[in-house]
A protein has these predicted regions:
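Short glycine/proline-centered loop/turn elements that form peptide/ligand docking sites
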Residues: 81, 104-107, 124-129
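Acetyl-CoA-dependent GNAT
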Residues: 3-72, 81-91, 139-143, 149-163
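Residue-level recognition of the GNAT/N-acetyltransferase active site
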Residues: 2, 68, 72, 99-103, ...
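Conserved catalytic-core motifs of GNAT/GCN5-like acyltransferases
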Residues: 97-99, 112, 117-134, 147
Length: 163
């Protein structure tokens, strides 16, 4: 993700989140090059999705991931999550975590394909609605078995979505 992508990112952010991040928050996150990575998915010149991950030692955390609602069900989220997990592995993580709304079953299904398992609930995590978050973890992401799982997931994606 670069500064020039922020207009497209913010358009998606405002569509999918009741309390969107500010452009300044994205810029701040993007400036932490040592342990954070932010990616965009594009169709032509249009930003259609984005995601971010931060790594501390052997743990990584997906900070955000979103796809333009007009482009749901096109495996864009799959590709973003694949690339974020690959980046976590590159940065030395052994495990990665995320939070997801308890009502967001579609995202939970996607995350479970990547080996994320629910480990707890954060009560009232989403302040704007009071909704709880499911905390999910994927362990042993550096293992050969997990890497094979990543390869199977991405090999089923359409050609334009593959690395």
């Amino acid at each position: 993700m670069r500064r020039r992508h922020l207009k497209g990112v913010m358009a998606i952010e405002r569509q999918v989140y009741p309390r969107p991040w500010s452009p300044n928050l994205f810029l701040s996150e993007m400036s932490e090059l040592r342990n954070r990575t932010y990616l965009v998915a594009k169709i032509g010149k249009d930003v259609v999705g984005y995601g971010g991950i931060m790594c501390y030692g052997e743990e990584a955390h997906v900070t955000t991931i979103a796809v333009d609602p007009e482009h749901h069900r096109k495996k864009i989220g799959t590709r973003l999550l694949h690339d974020l997990v690959q980046e976590a592995i590159r940065l030395g993580a052994q495990a990665t975590s995320l939070e997801v709304r308890v009502s967001n079953w579609g995202a939970q299904r996607l995350y479970s394909q990547f080996g994320f398992r629910p480990v707890g609930i954060r009560k009232n995590y989403y302040q704007e609605t009071g909704e709880d978050a499911v905390v999910m973890w994927a362990d042993n992401i550096r293992s050969a078995g997990y890497r094979e799982q990543l390869e199977r997931i991405i090999s089923r994606a359409p050609e334009g979505i593959r690395p």
